[in-house]
Swiss-Prot record:
Keywords linked to the UniProt accession: Methyltransferase, S-adenosyl-L-methionine, Transferase
UniProt source species: Hypomyces subiculosus
One biological process term in Gene Ontology: secondary metabolite biosynthetic process
Name assigned to this protein: O-methyltransferase hmp5
A Gene Ontology molecular function term of the record: O-methyltransferase activity
InterPro entries: COMT-like, O_MeTrfase_dom, Plant_O-MeTrfase_dimerisation, SAM-dependent_MTases_sf, WH-like_DNA-bd_sf, WH_DNA-bd_sf
Signal peptide, first to last residue: none
Top-rank EC class of the record's enzyme: transferase
């Protein structure tokens, strides 16, 4: 039921009050304000407009995809304005097509209009220009995944529940005609697709500071001979560098920080860039060679796989843990009840998992998964925003 006129006025006044409370660059406050605005918009818009908005979103996505892949945003960079004809000549595409794409982007206030068929960047479109701290690589990855999104309805109608959790029969693999290969094997068949994935993974990760590593000082000082943190599948060591910084280089002890990754990943890392960190080739489906570390650390790994694969990964770590070892899993933790009007990030990533064979989990689902490999959930350390969290687990107590 739509909100009444009186309710609309009251909520706008509430929005105004919230806006007046904002101080400086208060990102969390702005996020809360956006949530209120979005909820009001949904209550005011007529039902048929929901379809129109979805149609608009699909077309908008397609136009951004075209602009990125043709290099339009790159050619616009550094110019006060550029015409459709000039862009068309630069990318060898009919200028009428360029104009039609740009109309959608201008109407969405994403690109600025500088006269008839002339355009310029806005602060929003610049986010899609190649470079550090931009969204272009993540967008390109979602564009690859979108191919499988379109095929999921037919996949679900024709496949069994067991096939959905078979990592060699994912919607992504089937959409690209490569059933029998895992998501990562499909990616590896196309160097451009693999490069897109690797680039998107190097973009800013989850919120930091959720788990108090400083609280482990006493334990580490008491037993410095034990490895401090084993980062399993830790990429280029970004997390260990942050932990190193937070703990004053492991509280001044000789306790190790160990980065475990595939050999090909480790070969790309200059040891000088991760001073004080030990590189160790490792496949997390095999027996964990480092025993009784203070912390075993997984960041953005577990959500890439269905439960039966996660059990195989986690039992390797559990088999190496000592009585006081901790297992930390950096993941989104979904609320037990869906958060209406809140941040969509975790739900969007969960749908990515549906396509590629993984999933996001609730606290209850994490507890169940951990229990199957002899671990127990101790605590979920939540971040300030969104659904970012660290799941802490230990060996089950007798």
């Amino acid at each position: 039921m739509s909100a009444s006129n009186g309710e609309i006025v009251q909520r706008i006044e509430s929005l105004l009050a919230s806006a007046k409370k904002l101080q400086g660059d208060d990102q969390y406050g702005r996020f809360g304000l956006l949530k209120e605005i979005d909820l009001l918009y949904q209550d005011v818009e007529p039902p048929i407009n929901t379809f129109f908005k979805q149609w608009t979103s699909l077309t908008f996505f397609s136009c951004i995809d075209i602009a990125i892949k043709l290099g339009l945003f790159e050619h616009m960079k550094g110019r006060e304005s550029i015409t459709a004809k000039e862009l068309g000549a630069l990318v060898n595409v009919d200028d009428d097509v360029i104009a039609r794409v740009m109309r959608v982007l201008v109407a969405s206030r994403f690109v600025a209009s500088k006269g008839e068929d002339a355009y310029a960047h806005t602060h929003k479109s610049l986010v899609y220009v190649k470079g550090e701290h931009t969204a272009v690589d993540s967008f390109n990855l979602i564009s690859l995944l979108a191919v499988s999104y379109i095929t999921i309805p037919e996949y679900l109608k024709t496949r069994s529940a067991d096939e959905l959790v078979d990592i060699r029969k994912t919607p992504y693999a089937c959409a690209y005609g490569m059933e029998g290969k895992t998501f990562y094997e499909v990616l590896s068949t196309n160097p451009d697709h693999l490069d897109t994935f690797n680039r998107s993974m190097s973009e800013p990760g989850p919120e930091w500071g959720m788990f108090p590593f400083e609280s482990l000082r006493e334990n580490v000082l008491a037993e410095p001979e034990r490895p401090f943190v084993v980062d399993i599948g830790g990429g280029k060591g970004q997390a260990l560098l942050r932990i190193q910084e937070e703990t004053g280089k492991v509280f001044g002890t000789s306790s190790q920080l160990i980065l475990q990754e595939r050999p090909d990943v480790l070969e790309q890392i200059n040891q000088d860039d991760i001073a004080g960190i030990t590189k160790m080739p490792y496949d997390f489906h095999t027996k964990q060679p480092v025993k009784d570390a203070h912390v075993y650390f997984f960041s953005q790994i577990i959500h890439n796989y269905p439960d039966h694969v996660c059990q195989d990964i986690l039992k390797q770590a559990a088999g190496a843990m000592g009585p006081s070892s901790r297992l930390l899993i950096v993941e989104a933790v979904l609320p037990a009840q869906t958060d209406v009007g809140g941040d969509m990030g975790a739900y969007l990533i969960d749908f990515v998992g549906l396509a590629m064979g993984g999933k996001e989990r609730t606290e209850k689902e994490f507890a169940t998964l951990l229990g199957t490999v002899g671990l127990e959930l101790v605590k979920v350390w939540h971040g300030k925003a969104r659904h970012h969290a660290i799941v802490e687990a230990r060996l089950k107590r007798a």
